[in-house]
A protein has these predicted regions:
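Short secondary-structure boundary motifs at beta->alpha junctions and helix caps
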Residues: 28, 91-93, 108-158
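Short, Lys/Arg-enriched charge-dense amphipathic segments
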Residues: 79-89, 138-145, 186-190
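A structural detector for beta-sheet-dominated domains
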Residues: 13, 18-20, 74-76, 83, ...
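Unusually extended, aromatic-enriched hydrophobic runs near protein termini
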Residues: 49, 73-78, 96-100, 120-123, ...
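A structural "domain/chain start" motif
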Residues: 1-54, 62-63, 129-135, 147-192
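Surface-exposed short loop/turn segments
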Residues: 61-113
Length: 192
C-alpha cells in the first residue's frame, strides 16, 4: 500500500555495500565474493513475486530521474567473531557469523532516501580446536557458511566439509539451486 501511495513502479536496484568502493572486498570479504551469484539469484526471486501492491521492475531503468522509486539491499556489516568454548569438558572454537543489511528505499528524481529498514542476524558454528588457536580461518569454509546463512540452509559440519571438496563456483550454484528447490528464502527470519 505504501508503494502505491508514492508511485506505481518500484525499481529493484540490486545488492550493494555500505562502504566506499575501495573497501568492499576488504570489509565484506565473503559477501563481496558471493555478490555476483547472489545478485541475479535475488533478482530472479523478486521477479517471480506475485500479488504485490505495486509494479516491480527488476530490469534496468531507462532513466534515473523519471520519478521511479528504487530499492536496494545493502550489506552493512559482515563479521566473524571467534572464541574458545568448553563443551562437555572439551575446548572447541565457537565462530559467530554476524550479518546486518539495510533495505534502502530511494527517490531517484529528488535523489533522496525515503526509508532505511535495517535487519540483522547471526549464526553460530562449533569447530574443533586446532593448535590451541581459534583465530586461524578457512576462508572457503567461512564463505560457505555466509552463503548458507544468506540462503537459510542448514548443513552439518560434515556436510559443509563435503561441500568444500566441490569447486567454489559449482558449490555456489549447487546451493542456489537447493535454495530455489526448497524455497529456503521463505524460511521465517531469513536475512533476505
Amino acid at each position: 500500500e505504501e508503494a502505491k501511495a508514492i508511485g506505481e513502479t518500484v525499481q529493484w536496484a540490486g545488492i550493494s555495500f555500505v562502504t566506499s568502493a575501495a573497501d568492499v572486498s576488504e570489509q565484506f570479504k565473503h559477501s563481496s565474493r558471493l555478490n555476483k551469484d547472489l545478485r541475479p539469484f535475488l533478482t530472479k526471486k523478486l521477479s517471480s513475486l506475485d500479488n504485490l501492491s505495486f509494479d516491480l521492475n527488476t530490469g534496468n531503468s531507462e532513466r534515473s530521474d523519471d520519478g521511479t522509486i528504487s530499492f536496494l539491499l545493502a550489506t552493512d556489516t559482515e563479521r566473524i567473531s571467534t572464541g574458545k568454548l568448553n563443551v562437555n569438558n572439551e575446548i572447541r572454537c565457537l565462530s559467530i557469523y554476524s550479518i546486518s543489511l539495510q533495505a534502502i528505499v530511494y527517490d531517484q528524481k529528488s535523489q533522496s532516501i525515503l526509508q532505511i529498514i535495517p535487519f540483522a542476524g547471526e549464526v553460530n558454528h562449533l569447530d574443533p580446536l586446532v593448535g590451541n588457536d581459534c583465530k586461524k580461518r578457512n576462508n572457503d569454509l567461512d564463505s560457505l557458511r555466509i552463503l548458507l546463512f544468506y540462503l537459510s540452509i542448514d548443513k552439518s559440519r560434515a556436510e559443509q566439509l563435503e561441500l568444500l571438496k566441490i569447486p567454489f563456483e559449482e558449490r555456489v550454484n549447487q546451493l542456489l539451486k537447493e535454495s530455489n528447490d526448497q524455497n529456503s528464502l521463505e524460511t521465517p527470519n531469513n536475512l533476505f
